[in-house]
Curated annotation (Swiss-Prot):
Domain of life where this protein originates: Eukaryota
GO biological process: mitochondrial cytochrome c oxidase assembly; mitochondrial respiratory chain complex I assembly; protein import into mitochondrial matrix
Keywords from the named record: Membrane, Mitochondrion, Protein transport, Transit peptide, Translocation, Transmembrane, Transmembrane helix, Transport
Range of the transit peptide: 1-18
InterPro entries: Tim21, Tim21_IMS_sf
Function: Participates in the translocation of transit peptide-containing proteins across the mitochondrial inner membrane. Also required for assembly of mitochondrial respiratory chain complex I and complex IV as component of the MITRAC (mitochondrial translation regulation assembly intermediate of cytochrome c oxidase complex) complex. Probably shuttles between the presequence translocase and respiratory-chain assembly intermediates in a process that promotes incorporation of early nuclear-encoded subunits into these complexes.
Gene Ontology CC: TIM23 mitochondrial import inner membrane translocase complex
Designated name of the protein: Mitochondrial import inner membrane translocase subunit Tim21
Taxonomic lineage: Eukaryota, Metazoa, Chordata, Craniata, Vertebrata
The protein's assembly and partners: Component of the TIM23 complex. Component of the MITRAC (mitochondrial translation regulation assembly intermediate of cytochrome c oxidase complex) complex, the core components of this complex being COA3/MITRAC12 and COX14. Interacts with COA3 and MT-CO1/COX1.
Gene3D superfamilies per record: Mitochondrial import inner membrane translocase subunit Tim21 (3.10.450.320)
Membrane topology qualifier: Single-pass membrane protein
Ranges in a coiled coil: none
PANTHER family linked to this entry: MITOCHONDRIAL IMPORT INNER MEMBRANE TRANSLOCASE SUBUNIT TIM21 (PTHR13032:SF6)
Gene that this polypeptide is encoded by: TIMM21
């Protein structure tokens, strides 16, 4: 009976895969306790079943200890990660510097564009002022010559009142452009202007030719001559002639 139980215990240990010596040896068990060994062997089997779990738990504990043993290596990895972070922070610093350089270049480009826009706007304002308000502008000279033609009696008698003036005809049919030519002679500026006049008399239209010369003392233009040429007729009206 005892031998059968011992064989059962060994088979159980082999099935559980537990290394080491068996719990109870045959020579260590007294013969007088043979009648009471069956419960004790059963208790031993139960104890073996219950102690198998702690061995598994012990295996987990060994694994945790092995992980803790590797903790210095993980600490080194953490250190390397910190170093990489510092390097990345250094990279960010370099990147921020490049961004500052790019922003500075962009601001400089915007400044150049603004300056170019200001210069173009200033040139346009200067041209508009010169064309409209300056005494040496072609439009200003055109206005003065037109007033002289309107007040001339021969022009009024031929064309009738009111006398209107206009410039060259554009592609859209507008009469706004006044043709002129600027040149220098004897160190003085000259300008020749041409425009057209028309009165209340139907079918009569005239072409005004004039020339101005710069006054060396005042710097303003003075009329040299103003002629009105009748297109349908070969006739010329002299409004003003200061060439002599």
């Amino acid at each position: 009976m005892i031998c059968t139980l011992l064989r059962a215990v060994r088979c159980t240990e082999r099935l559980h895969g537990c290394p080491g010596k068996p719990w109870f040896l045959p020579h260590s068990v007294p013969h007088r306790a043979c009648s009471q060994t069956e419960p004790r062997w059963r208790w031993g089997l139960q104890e073996q079943n219950t102690t198998a779990r702690p061995r598994c738990i012990w295996g987990v504990t060994q694994r945790s200890i092995w992980t803790q043993v590797r903790s210095p290596q993980s600490a080194k990895e953490d250190g390397s990660k910190q170093v990489s972070v510092h390097r990345s922070q250094g990279g960010e610093t370099v990147l921020s510097t490049s961004q500052k350089v790019k922003e500075a270049g962009r601001d400089f480009t915007y400044l150049i564009v603004v300056l170019i826009g200001i210069s173009i706007t200033g040139g346009l304002f200067y041209t508009i002022f010169r064309e409209l308000f300056s005494s040496s502008s072609p439009n200003k000279i055109y206005g003065k010559a037109l007033e002289k033609c309107r007040s001339h009696p021969e022009v009024i008698s031929v064309f009738g009142e009111p006398v209107k003036g206009y410039g060259e005809v554009t592609r859209r049919g507008r009469r706004q452009l006044v043709s002129f030519i600027e040149y220098k002679k004897d160190g003085l500026k000259h300008m020749r202007v041409k425009f057209y006049i028309q009165g209340s008399e139907p079918g009569k239209q005239g072409t005004v030719h004039l020339e101005v010369k710069e006054n060396p003392e005042s710097g303003e233009y003075e009329f040299r001559y103003i002629f009105v040429e009748l297109e349908p007729y070969s006739r010329t009206i002299v409004v003003e002639d200061n060439r002599s």
